[in-house]
Amino acid sequence: MSKLKVVGEKSLTNSSRVVGLLAQLEKINTDSTESDTARYVTSKILHLAQSQEKTRREMTTKGSTGMEVLLSTLENTKDLQTVLNILSILIELVSSGGGRRASFLVAKGGSQILLQLLMNASKDSPPHEEVMVQTHSILAKIGPKDKKFGVKARVNGALTVTLNLVKQHFQNYRLVLPCLQLLRVYSTNSVNSVSLGKNGVVELMFKIIGPFSKKNSGLMKVALDTLAALLKSKTNARRAVDRGYVQVLLTIYVDWHRHDNRHRNMLIRKGILQSLKSVTNIKLGRKAFIDANGMKILYNTSQECLAVRTLDPLVNTSSLIMRKCFPKNRLPLPTIKSSFHFQLPIIPVTGPVAQLYSLPPEVDDVVDESDDNDDIDLEVENELENEDDLDQSFKNDDIETDINKLRPQQVPGRTIEELKMYEHLFPELVDDFQDYELISKEPKPFVFEGKARGPIVVPTAGEEVPGNSGSVKKGVVMKERASPKGEEAKEDPKGHDRTLPQQLGGQSRVAPSAHSFNNDLVKALDRITLQNVPSQVASGLNAGMRKDFGLPLTVLSCTKACPHVAKCGSTLFEGRTVHLGKLCCTGVETEDDEDTESHSSTEQAPSVEASDGPTLHDPDLYIEIVKNTKSVPEYSEVAYPDYFGHIPPPFKEPILERPYGVQRTKIAQDIERLIHQNDIIDRVVYDLDNPTYTTPEEGDTLKFNSKFESGNLRKVIQIRKSEYDLILNSDINSNHYHQWFYFEVSGMRPGVAYRFNIINCEKSNSQFNYGMQPLMYSVQEALNARPWWIRMGTDICYYKNHFSRSSVAAGGQKGKSYYTITFTVNFPHKDDVCYFAYHYPYTYSTLQMHLQKLESAHNPQQIYFRKDVLCETLSGNICPLVTITAMPESNYYEHICQFRTRPYIFLSARVHPGETNASWVMKGTLEYLMSNSPTAQSLRESYIFKIVPMLNPDGVINGNHRCSLSGEDLNRQWQSPNPELHPTIYHAKGLLQYLAAVKRLPLVYCDYHGHSRKKNVFMYGCSIKETVWHTHDNSASCDIVEDMGYRTLPKILSHIAPAFCMSSCSFVVEKSKESTARVVVWREIGVQRSYTMESTLCGCDQGRYKGLQIGTRELEEMGAKFCVGLLRLKRLTSSLEYNLPSNLLDFENDLIESSCKVTSPTTYVLDEDEPRFLEEVDYSAESNDELDVELAENTGDYEPSAQEEALSDSEVSRTHLI
């Protein structure tokens, strides 16, 4: 205790001493004659400031007057020693404690007083060196904390004082060093920088810097930093170029690089590079850099630095300079418009499509004439630091602030008479079911009867695809109609050598007789064309695979027993339908025990609640449906993945860890194209714009194809022996949206690392930088009973490239560049046929096949299922409308009344063709709704589902990414859809308007989407209160009364769906989204629970699937979980107590509880939710990235208050039902 008391007394004494000395100094200020006393007092304060942190803290604490006293004394005293003492005190104060104390000194007026002191001291002849050194030192420290420092210094005339000191005392390094530090601070003001340049500061800097020297390295470092800041001025940069200083900088850099063997002067070498980076911001600087052989110099020096990790800043800066100076290249295309043309029935008056049609034919829309004339923005080096602020500013500006616009109000649309055209699509509202064979003829309580099922009729290839299926009557499925028989097949002239498939990562043992057969089989399967139909080998092949392969097929016997096949060996495929699990019985031995164990031991992915219906894939049926699908290119081929089908792989696929240095390695290889031009092949191997082009037949060249449904690949150029540049096609009637890809590759060799570069991407960022991989499908693997898409590729990165993007394609902005997705693949099989896709493909024909299979297999006594035609698309394809609910228990009034009064759920998907994950989620929803599970039956009895599973069939068919054939984003047309240009949106909105007109407003509307920039699954909804809250108008948000029911469904899903993340949800209404389905259905139709459900293209960073890439299993599970969430929502929102048999209630609760046990708490996810890599990800070479439109949808990652997290009062009263 005594020791603590002594310490306390000592601290109190020291504190009191400083306060006393400051009080004494304040009194002395009024008497200018007591200079000796002021000198003594300031020396005592200096001693305390140098020795005790507590003293320094006492003088800079809020409320302390110590700083004012010191500054007042400094301003008024004439005594030199007192001035030096106070300057030393100020240096002690600002040299510790971080920037807070410097800001404190600025807030007390220190900048102005010190600048005035500098001016007064400069009038002495000669100026006192110590005063100048200390004053410049303090100003260099506090200047960056004063936003108006540059203006103050210029107005006071301090610029000339500091510059003259450097000129006059060139050899006095002690004085020159703080002067250079202050010049660097002056130069942050562009006007000051130009003024200093006119007075010879650039020439002065080049006198100070020089070749390698062990002396005065500190001065060299500061001089280079100052020079780099000065050269950010275009005027100064031009002056440096005119005097040949670019060559000087390169020479100095090479000299320091050669002599700095121990890398002790890395900061000096980086300072030289920073000066080069500044001077190459202008076109003249870049030209001078190229002329001085700068590309080769920096390339060679950076390659020599790769072995030393501490030199990474030099490598990264060198890479940035080289990318910036790399000559802008023209994308090797005749036009940026799509290779395919579709004539619209009417041309819009305004908008991008109108501009596209009005563009004169002589205008080059690929690149601007003066694309490289504009100098680069001076703030480019702050691009990464400012990106988040720019995004946040954009989002805040995009938030709707007009309360009147936010309030839902039904807009007068079509009249009742006009809406009557949709009556035939709602027969469930008027049907009395007198002609149906229902389960019961008497009203009685519902009793679930397990798996009672009706007849299942699987359509075959001989059936015609029905265009409009009515309701099922008398418990019998719709009658079949024969389709025209196919034409005779023609021999495929493009046979390629194929070897037997090998298992990924392992070898397969092949029977001698099987080898030649399977080799011929894959060789013959070079193309599946719609003209090939059964003819010559009908006795040996399954109907789904009966093609004229152009060669005889040898009858084989299976060398291994297959327990899952009843009869095997006499033919290639058994049975009427192709079952992919039986493809091992082609004469190929099944995998050996070790290989089998390696697959089976792989950790299994969590299972989805499976429907008990039959498989939905039927190759035979798929071919017949494709024949009726209308595409603009008139596709005649079928991709193998769509034909064979896809099943989720039985193993998990983790998010890929990014190797260190992969981006700079790829960029260095791109730069080598300019340095070593003789190594570049530059040969076109695939060209959609040249109909007469034939694929080269060289054995070492890959062959490409995308002429099938949903395919997108426009041109391929072979760069090196195993490197290819790929160019994607624009959306039809558009000149951009290059993101979705789906193409075929063949002719590969195992053991070769093939690099693929997709070089005309447009988005400024991608999940490919954060662990996402493209998808690959191997035909050899499918024949080996592994028919699945898998994540494939290494060394994946996404970065800005040197291909120029024209202002026509960039919305009027000049100087934009494209981005590259690059990935490397090692193929395991020789001469395989492989497919690559941006995400799991799901074609329009696949949807039609799935719907037909669901219709054929459902139990008509239990499930009410209708597949109607909503409308025809621009190209004449039908847009299906599906109605699903439970059949009434009987045709008695009570049951019919209950049937008709069920609330509606309206679902839609795939308005954006490239978001294929939306279709997989919809598939999960449809399969669940059609299943025989108890909760599915309960769900059907609770709601009537109206579903438009594909809002943009034409876009999906033709391989578009975002638009329909009208060249417009259909999800921006909901406010005023044109019936001729946007028929699917026009009629989907008409359905909703009809429901509103007949007072049957849907309880929930949800549009399924995919998100390319974020992880997990999440929802966007609409809320007035949360939108106003994000405008920071708290008073206005407090006055708004709003039902919080819109949060209920997302919160339910966050508990039961492992991929769903509540913290990523947003309920803010943005101006840029006012014409989307979510906002229009909420605002105009009046549906409170109007959502967009976004599914990641990449994977999850929370919950059960944390660290895993998402697959079709997880997407379909999300669709099923969405249905379970709707059932729980029913119990929370029902006006009457909703009781179920206890066994059903327990069943659902068990399902929910099991999901909750394995779901970790969600994390708050920001727009850029990824941690930084050890290697800084640099997406661009020079200019600020354009703000991605999609980022606007991220607005409002909202952290709700406790009250808003709770359910509404009406919901809380019913929580006992859960």
UniProtKB/Swiss-Prot annotation:
Q: Which residues form the active site?
A: E1094
Does the record's keyword annotation contain Ribonucleoprotein?
Answer: no
Give start and end of each Peptidase M14 domain.
Answer: 840-1130
Phenotype seen when the gene is deleted: Knockout pcd mice show hyperglutamylation of alpha- and beta-tubulins in the brain. Knockout mice promote somatic cell reprogramming and higher litter size at birth.
* Phenotype upon changing H982L: Decreased tubulin deglutamylation
Name positions with the PTM Phosphoserine. S1160
User: Which terms in the GO cellular component ontology are assigned?
Assistant: axon cytoplasm; centriolar satellite; ciliary basal body; cytoplasm; cytosol; mitochondrion; nucleoplasm; nucleus
Q: What is the effect of changing H912A?
A: Abolishes ability to rescue Purkinje cell degeneration in pcd mice when expressed in a transgene
GO term, biological process aspect, one: protein side chain deglutamylation
Q: Where is the signal peptide?
A: none
Entry binding sites for Zn(2+): H912, E915, H1009
One Pfam entry for this protein is Peptidase_M14
Q: Which family does it belong to?
A: Belongs to the peptidase M14 family.
The protein's job, in short, is:
Metallocarboxypeptidase that mediates protein deglutamylation of tubulin and non-tubulin target proteins. Catalyzes the removal of polyglutamate side chains present on the gamma-carboxyl group of glutamate residues within the C-terminal tail of alpha- and beta-tubulin. Specifically cleaves tubulin long-side-chains, while it is not able to remove the branching point glutamate. Also catalyzes the removal of polyglutamate residues from the carboxy-terminus of alpha-tubulin as well as non-tubulin proteins such as MYLK.
Subunit-structure text: Interacts with MYLK.
Report the protein name in the record. Cytosolic carboxypeptidase 1
* Species: Mus musculus
Q: What is the lineage of its organism?
A: Eukaryota, Metazoa, Chordata, Craniata, Vertebrata
